[in-house]
Each structure stands twice: as structure tokens, then as C-alpha cells.
UniProtKB/Swiss-Prot annotation:
Part of the 50S ribosomal subunit. Keywords: Ribonucleoprotein, Ribosomal protein, RNA-binding, rRNA-binding. This protein binds to the 23S rRNA, and is important in its secondary structure. It is located near the subunit interface in the base of the L7/L12 stalk, and near the tRNA binding site of the peptidyltransferase center. One of its GO terms (molecular function) is structural constituent of ribosome. GO terms for biological process: cytoplasmic translation. It comes from Prosthecochloris aestuarii (strain DSM 271 / SK 413). This is Large ribosomal subunit protein uL6. One of its GO terms (cellular component) is cytosolic large ribosomal subunit. Belongs to the universal ribosomal protein uL6 family.
Length: 180
């Protein structure tokens, strides 16, 4: 049995869960999330705990078992607490600012990059070198953060670029002058 899949998910006090027509809906103070279930797994609610069980023991069923347990867990966490990713910008003249609903990035190119976030995600710039992305859908928050990072990934020689706050950039040593 999947080690992750067999652990029950604790249902938070503020969260409400509903299963109808193979669609699981979790709602809470921050919003509502829905997820389509695959036929290999089923979800049961009892005593404030959500358990995910699988139909058979095939390889796909075992994979879906752990996956859907974590998806349900992330949905419960998202509608109660929410998720946040933090990006750090390093480099001379590199900065970010919010212009109405657009994120304006100055990253050393000949032009500014404007990024419009999806409606489910909020972006904030507490200072010009920090970007905070928050929302209730963990996958969408991570996807938006990865898209912003892709505009200028950190380079290994000086570390200039956009990186996640918990990311460690592997640095390389530059060329050294040799004897002729």
C-alpha cells in the first residue's frame, strides 16, 4: 500500500468537503477548489478525516492513490491557510514593481517584461528585489512562480537573475589567466 496514500487527511474546522459525480469540492474561508477523481481511487469522509482508497493493486492505481491523497491534502490546506512562494531578484539594476494589475520586471534586457497573473493568484512586491506569489491552488502558485523565474534564471558565475527564496544557486569559477 502507498505510504503516503494510506495516511488520512485531517479535515480543518473551517473546511467543508463534498463529493458528487466523481468530483471532490473543498471550500473554506479563502475560497473553493475542485478536483476530478480518476476511477482508480475513491474518497471517504468519516470523523473529520478524509481517507483515499484504491480499487485494485495495479501500478497505476498505486501511483494515483498517493497522488490524489496529496491533492486532497493540498486542497484542504489551500482553502484554509493558502500557499505562498517568494522570489528574490539579484543583479545590478534588476527590479520588480506592480503597475496596477501587471508585474513590471526590469531584468537587463532592452525592454521591460510585463506579466499578468491569473485571477486566482495575487502578486505583491514588498520591495524592488522581492516578489511574493500567493493563492489557494498550490500547483498554480508554483506554476506562476516558475514562469516568472524563467524570464531570467540565475546564472552560475555571478548569481544574477530571479531565484526562489529557498533555492541554492551552484556557482562556477570563472576563467583564470594561464601562462603562455
Amino acid at each position: 500500500m502507498s505510504r503516503i496514500g494510506k495516511m488520512p487527511v485531517q479535515l480543518a474546522d473551517q473546511a467543508k468537503i463534498e463529493i458528487k459525480d466523481n468530483v471532490i469540492t473543498v471550500s473554506g474561508p479563502k475560497g473553493t477548489l475542485q478536483q476530478q477523481l480518476v476511477p482508480e481511487v475513491s474518497v471517504d469522509i468519516a470523523d473529520g478525516q478524509i481517507t483515499v482508497t484504491r480499487a485494485d493493486d495495479t501500478k497505476r492505481s498505486r501511483a494515483m492513490h498517493g497522488l490524489y491523497r496529496m491533492l486532497v491534502s493540498n486542497m484542504v490546506d489551500g482553502v484554509t491557510k493558502g500557499f505562498t512562494r517568494k522570489l528574490l531578484i539579484s543583479g545590478v539594476g534588476f527590479r520588480a514593481e506592480m503597475k496596477s494589475d501587471l508585474l513590471a520586471l526590469t531584468l537587463g534586457y532592452s525592454h521591460q517584461i510585463y506579466f499578468k497573473a491569473p485571477e486566482e493568484v495575487t502578486i505583491a512586491c514588498p520591495d524592488p528585489t522581492t516578489i511574493e506569489i500567493s493563492g489557494i491552488d498550490k500547483a498554480l502558485v508554483g506554476q506562476v512562480a516558475a514562469k516568472i523565474r524563467s524570464f531570467r534564471k540565475p546564472e552560475p558565475y555571478r548569481g544574477k537573475g530571479i531565484k526562489f527564496s529557498d533555492e541554492v544557486v551552484r556557482r562556477k569559477e570563472g576563467k583564470t589567466a594561464g601562462k603562455k
